[in-house]
Amino acid sequence: MLKYPDYLSKLISFLRKLPGIGFKTAEKLAFELLDWEQDQLEALGKAFSELSIARSHCPCCFCLKNFPESQCEFCQNNRDTSTLCIVASPKDIFSLERSQVFKGHYYVLGTLLSPLTGKHIEEERMRLLKQRIEFLNPKEIILALDATLEGDATALFLKQELAYSLASISRLALGLPIGLSFDYIDSGTLARAFSGRNPY
């Protein structure tokens, strides 16, 4: 029976926990790492250690921030307060920033609603979102959510929850394929989606 050394089996096992990584890919990556120089492996190990120690979220928008700074770079910078873009994950913010079409503020929900699995948005996160809207007083709230059932459910929920606001609510439309996650959308497509957003 095939049996790898314990250190290699453990590495393959951890790599398989990453989304989209099956056994074959994890095995290939593990053997690739075996060929790395000692200093490269130590640098990688240091990066993982820093990730576990320094990872933190901005108290204003819940994007990732550098430790020990009090806010993320987007909340620190002098950005347009007339627009607030709501996303599901911090990685969505970086996708939108690469498209270079949005200059306003962000807010991260942390998840999308999923009626099938019972996943919901935390009450505290919604309370802080409303607080953020009150503070910024934006003219437009943009729902930059995945074009999936979960994204649709979340957009409908937010439209109802934020109906009290005087801000107009829009959602990205043009260029976002149905059923596709933000992870697979290029910056050009995102730019078109932003330009062609519709009232929601």
Swiss-Prot record:
Q: Give residue ranges for domain Toprim.
A: 82-177
Q: Which GO terms describe its molecular function?
A: DNA binding; zinc ion binding
Q: Which SUPFAM superfamilies does the entry mention?
A: Recombination protein RecR
Q: Which UniProt keywords apply?
A: DNA damage, DNA recombination, DNA repair, Metal-binding, Zinc, Zinc-finger
ZnF (C4-type) ranges: 58-75
Keyword Metal-binding on entry: yes
Determine if Cell inner membrane is one of this entry's keywords: no
Pfam families attached here? RecR_C (PF21175), RecR_HhH (PF21176), Toprim_4 (PF13662)
Biological process (GO), any one? DNA recombination
Domain of life of the source: Bacteria
Spans through the membrane: none
Q: Its biological function?
A: May play a role in DNA repair. It seems to be involved in an RecBC-independent recombinational process of DNA repair. It may act with RecF and RecO.
Q: Which family does it belong to?
A: Belongs to the RecR family.
Name of this chain's protein: Recombination protein RecR
User: What is the species listed in this Swiss-Prot or TrEMBL entry?
Assistant: Chlamydia felis (strain Fe/C-56) (Chlamydophila felis)
